[in-house]
Amino acid sequence: MAATADSAKSLGLAACVAVVVGNMVGSGFYLSPAAVAPSGLLAVVMWIVMGVGAICLGLSFARLATLAPATGGPYAYARMAYGDFAGFLIAWGYWISVWASLPAIAFAFAGALMNLLPALNNKAMALALTLGAIWAVVGINLRGVKAAGLFAEVTTYAKLLPFGAIALVGLFYVRAENLSEFNPSGEPLLSAAAALAPLTMFAYLGLESATVPAGDVRDAQRTIPRSTLIGIAIAAALYVLGTVVVLGVVPRDQLLGSVAPFADAARLMWGEGAALAVALAVIVSSIGALNGWTLLMGQVPMAAAQDKLFPGAFGRVSARGVPALGIVISAALATLLVAFQASGSPGVRAFYNLLVSLSTMTAVVPYAFCALALPLVAAWRGQRGPGAPRLGVVELIAFAFSLFTIYGCGPEAVLYGLTLLLLGLPVFVWQRRQARKEEAC
């Protein structure tokens, strides 16, 4: 019976790798070279440093998934380790980071499509494309986890070919003079590195993706750790090599104002046809990332709602087995963010940067908690004594990496992030009160 139940689950190794890579290699990948261009070669060093931190976080999540696979990922582990209140805050913050990142990815999709088809380049069309992308992907996810996983596989493997070609073949086109400056910003090294942390970390968000839908993963104790590490390794290689190529091919002055740095690099190396192929890959990449994050957007609050820590609406499952109402509510909040930007308050680039910092801040806090959760989760599972799992160097590096990223987000993003976390307190109090009433009946 156990085997039958496991074989009926929707996500295997290929789908889990696709979800991890698809979530990580999104807008942060192909927009980041322009954002980090003022930092020169220091940006490449930071991709490597943050990649090491991401791998350590991935190993931490892999150990947790092997010990206690549970739907909800970071939320589930935080609740096991620290109790209901910490679990709620982690679920709340993680959920915010997911739906707040959707407009940033959708903005990138709209920008890439308008760059490809200049006739679409106007404010009304940008708004329509952004919202259309979000709600089209919501429609795919409402069809079920299997459909979302298949879509993740198709979009991920479709975008790896052009991005991989630039990252590998493009190395032969790098001009040494474009890579001559290590830290041209003139800022102290630590300050410059800290400023790069959220920009690079945003591209690594999603490293835990395979742990979130654990209840739908076949052979979860083996599949989740393997897919997590494979996905991080693929993404890190693309980030480091891709950034070297773009910085080494596109002149710095041109790169600083670029809205499509990978397309610019492809154009300089191979002509307009290659730039067109990259633009198409960016569009596919954005849709794939939107799909993966939408999948997670419903799973985390669903797990919390089933534990009576989130409103019950988030835990209601449709006939197709998906938390449909939770996905729709989350997408509606993302739509409000898009509408706020469309009202003319912040510019698109400034708003994108704010969303990057906010999403990074609210996602990295759960990472920090989970990095130290292993021995507590082991105790929750009844494993105590000399042979029980303990914190190692990997977990301590992951924790330090998370703290450094929070520091790099800056006071404004930290303040916004903490404010959003505190706004969840009335929800927690209300849910606990409702749970006590149900227990008393």
Where are these regions (language model features)?
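Helix-loop-helix connectors at the membrane interface of multi-pass transporters/channels
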Residues: 1-4, 76-79, 106-129, 162, ...
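TM-loop-TM module centered on a large, flexible mid-protein loop between adjacent transmembrane helices
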Residues: 76-77, 83, 114-119, 229-294, ...
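Membrane-interface "cap" regions at the ends of multi-pass membrane proteins
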Residues: 1-34, 38-39, 55, 59, ...
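Helix-loop-helix junctions that connect adjacent transmembrane segments
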Residues: 2-8, 43-44, 120-126, 154-280, ...
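Extracellular loop-to-transmembrane helix junctions
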Residues: 8, 31-123, 129, 231-237, ...
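Membrane-interface loop-to-helix entry segments
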Residues: 125-176, 187-188, 228-232, 360-368, ...
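Membrane-helix boundary/coupling elements in multi-pass transport proteins
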Residues: 30, 70, 93-108, 204, ...
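A generic transmembrane alpha-helix motif of multi-pass inner-membrane proteins
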Residues: 363, 376, 388-441
